[in-house]
Regions:
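Iron-sulfur-associated redox domains of electron-transfer enzymes in respiratory
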Residues: 2-153
Length: 153
């Protein structure tokens, strides 16, 4: 959290946050909002008031991941690649497979997780659109699982 606060207070930094859909749902339950309340809008407004320059939902990254995994499957099917294709957005599961099933690693999709894909888009496309050096973009991911920290670069 200290690094996030520091970035939010640095005028040179363009701070972007992405939030997993599960977090939005959990906030709605935690604050006992009735079903149908725009939790996403309230959360985005709160994050902007905290100083984030852009607020995104990770579901866009999930769409990118699905498209890339589909392309990877087609590529493997067309070129006698390793099957079955195993996909997972869970870094904890990937670590488990690396440790206990190294013989299956060729079956695991090479695609990034949704929050990694979205981070890559922010550091390239958004940086280009907003004319910001990618080194000045700080990407913050709010995820429901602590094992996502294994994916941080």
């Amino acid at each position: 959290m200290d690094e996030v606060k520091e970035a939010l207070n640095d005028p040179e930094k363009y701070v972007v946050v992405q939030v997993a859909p599960a977090v939005r749902a959990a906030l709605g339950e935690a604050f006992e909002f009735p079903i149908g309340v725009d939790v996403e809008g309230r959360m985005a407004e709160a994050l902007r008031r905290l100083g984030f320059d852009k607020v995104f939902d990770t579901k866009f990254g999930a769409d990118l991941t699905i498209m890339e995994e589909s392309n990877e499957l087609i590529e493997r099917l067309n070129n006698d690649g390793e099957l079955p294709l195993i996909t997972s957005c869970c870094p904890g599961w990937i670590k488990y497979a690396e440790h206990f099933y190294p013989d299956m690693l060729e079956n695991i999709s090479s695609c990034k997780s949704p929050h990694q894909m979205q981070g890559a888009i922010v550091k390239t496309y958004l940086a280009n659109q907003e004319h910001i050096a990618k080194e000045n973009i700080v990407m913050v991911s709010v995820m429901p699982c602590t094992t996502k920290k294994f994916e941080i670069t």
